[in-house]
Amino acid sequence: MRSFTAFVRPPGVSFPQAISSHPAKEEIDLSRAREQHRSYVNALKKAGAKILAIPPEDSLPDSTFVEDTAFVFEDRAFLCFLKEETRRNEMESIEKTLKGYRKTVNLPPYLDGGDILDLSLIHI
């Protein structure tokens, strides 16, 4: 099993106000979301991940989605300038964490890291 590092951040108290177009958005259950996040972290561990947990940002509802703020490729961590203004304050703690792990590169606007797909481990 290959090992890898996964950065995670549990949902903060404001998570029920996260940006969403889902019709049941008003029914977000914070306790359930936190339990689901713990299950996600456990699945990552079972897959061989070393977990680096970033503390929750209670004032930033979407901050649990760390994959949007940055992505790592080889020896660099690419920091994404998020288009959604309400999410830009998430970057400070992400950048601080990643600087201890990789050389960071600030990308020009706009890119969500969740839009990146690394296919380097796929052999065709």
Annotated model-derived regions:
Residues 1-122:
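The feature marks the mature, well-folded catalytic cores of soluble enzymes
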